[in-house]
Amino acid sequence: MGCIKSKEDKGPAIKYRNTPEPVSVSHYGAEPTQATPWPSSSGWGTAFNFSSLSMTGFGGSSGVTPFGGASSSFSVVPSPYPAGLTGGVTIFVALYDYEARTTEDLSFKGGERFQIINNTEGDWWEARSIATGKNGYIPSNYVAPADSIAAEEWYFGKMGRKDAERLLLNPGNQRGIFLVRESETTKGAYSLSIRDWDEIRGDNVKHYKIRKLDNGGYYITTRAQFDTLQKLVKHSTEHADGLCHKLTTVCPTVKPQTQGLAKDAWEIPRESLRLEVKLGQGCFGEVWMGTWNGTTKVAIKTLKLGTMMPEAFLQEAQIMKKLRHDKLVPLYAVVSEEPIYIVTEFMSKGSLLDFLKEGDGKYLKLPQLVDMAAQIADGMAYIERMNYIHRDLRAANILVGENLVCKIADFGLARLIEDNEYTARQGAKFPIKWTAPEAALYGRFTIKSDVWSFGILQTELTTKGRVPYPGMVNREVLEQVERGYRMPCPQGCPESLHELMNLCWKKDPDERPTFEYIQSFLEDYFTAAEPQYQPGENL
């Protein structure tokens, strides 16, 4: 967790599932039960959760500031499962192997079948293994109803076009590898996504709409209709029949992160955590790689005494844990007595800032950097929909995983910091260079001030981690920005991308784009804005 040091004081961030559209409730209202969203997914788990996704910390060389913030409203997703799944009458099948983490969990193998005894707990269901007869808790995102489409290995549920392309284009995948997902545009329809190759585009992904007939059948072209989706897929593995290539193998996936560490593992005892490898430190604490309960690798943020009030932290953490999106680092558990510990998903690649400056990010070209920006915009568009605010969006607070997957960290806590050097907003610990002028000068933090910060983050990406406003101290940045100064286009950066940055830096917050627009712009960047892009020396 770290801080920004100004010059004045000499001191130096595989499967996919989106969260369904929420139902709004009061930001500080009673905490509702929230189940893992389904059946908008395959039951394969939450999205793009590579098991080795990285976690960095607060500071170290990257100067990470600790956290984000909140606005006045928040939304949650109600349980999509009917109450009728109680009584042990519904059969579910395991999609992955799972090793028990506590004495109340069940270990199981993929393909094992269960009777669901009680699903009212949301993320962890009480179940009975049909094979062993044992009862225990299982993670609900590791199972799907037996004999359903969701139980098929090729079904990836509610996944966007861009995320399907990211998965299929991963290194090592071959032509003909495929997946099936929900259609983004047509309710009740599906999309078949196939990796292809041609001389003009090289490796690419083709998408085909699978439509449903009134009588329940499925088709891509009307001349070939099938009773079930399974029969359509099987036929397409044997005959291209108008597709770019016949289907070869299912796109590989890695089992997802569970929602939380275990049943009722939210406020946990300090003794259940073992701190093993220190990953970084900053003004407000440290971050460690560690183990929970002797079984589960996690990241642990330890806060210095007095950083924030435990009661305020716990209240905010209850809200933060409800924010679930594949581009946000999930909050697993807390130690709520000082010194406060925050337990999150462990991510191995480090912060985006360190990755760009010292890791493999140094060698990335513009397409990869724009895709990373699009992923961050995807996560921020979710925060935007949920009426939340980050407050500290920058490369130091973005975490990088395998295959360049990005997740947003440290959202929801910046407004809780008690340190005078931070709360003054112009103190040495405050990230002035990333903060919109109305927020830095008057404390007006909104999602539009996050948009400003995203524009600054784009300069970090295109300059491989250079500090914004090079050669300028914090006070000078504030004065110059108020007078209308904006950073020039980084060397090698296309002007069309710099134009997006300038939109993010509009003086009037209402004139700045939404994250939904930014995500769309970046995802289609090389087809709409820069179709003639050619790699340069740096970008």
Swiss-Prot record:
Pfam families: PK_Tyr_Ser-Thr, SH2, SH3_1. Residues 154-251 form the SH2 domain. Residues 273-526 form the Protein kinase domain. Keywords: ATP-binding, Cell junction, Cell membrane, Cytoplasm, Cytoskeleton, Kinase, Lipoprotein, Membrane, Myristate, Nucleotide-binding, Palmitate, Phosphoprotein, Proto-oncogene, SH2 domain, SH3 domain, Transferase, Tyrosine-protein kinase. InterPro entries: Kinase-like_dom_sf, Non-receptor_tyrosine_kinases, Prot_kinase_dom, Protein_kinase_ATP_BS, Ser-Thr/Tyr_kinase_cat_dom, SH2, SH2_dom_sf, SH3-like_dom_sf. Residues 87-148 form the SH3 domain. A lipid is attached at residue 3 (S-palmitoyl cysteine). The modification Phosphotyrosine is found at residues 28, 332, 341, 422, 533. It is an enzyme of class 2 (transferase). A lipid is attached at residue 2 (N-myristoyl glycine). It is found in: Cell membrane; Cytoplasm, Cytoskeleton, Microtubule organizing center, Centrosome; Cytoplasm, Cytosol; Cell junction. The modification Phosphothreonine is found at residue 19. GO terms for biological process: cell differentiation; cell surface receptor protein tyrosine kinase signaling pathway. Phosphorylated. Phosphorylation by CSK on the C-terminal tail maintains the enzyme in an inactive state. Autophosphorylation at Tyr-422 maintains enzyme activity by blocking CSK-mediated inhibition. Belongs to the protein kinase superfamily. Tyr protein kinase family. SRC subfamily. Interacts with YAP1. Interacts with FASLG. Interacts with CTNND1; this interaction allows YES1-mediated activation of FYN and FER and subsequent phosphorylation of CTNND1. Interacts with CSF1R. Interacts with IL6ST/gp130. Interacts with SCRIB, when YES1 is in a closed conformation; the interaction facilitates YES1 autophosphorylation. PANTHER family: TYROSINE-PROTEIN KINASE. Non-receptor protein tyrosine kinase that is involved in the regulation of cell growth and survival, apoptosis, cell-cell adhesion, cytoskeleton remodeling, and differentiation. Stimulation by receptor tyrosine kinases (RTKs) including EGFR, PDGFR, CSF1R and FGFR leads to recruitment of YES1 to the phosphorylated receptor, and activation and phosphorylation of downstream substrates. Upon EGFR activation, promotes the phosphorylation of PARD3 to favor epithelial tight junction assembly. This is Tyrosine-protein kinase Yes. It comes from Canis lupus familiaris.
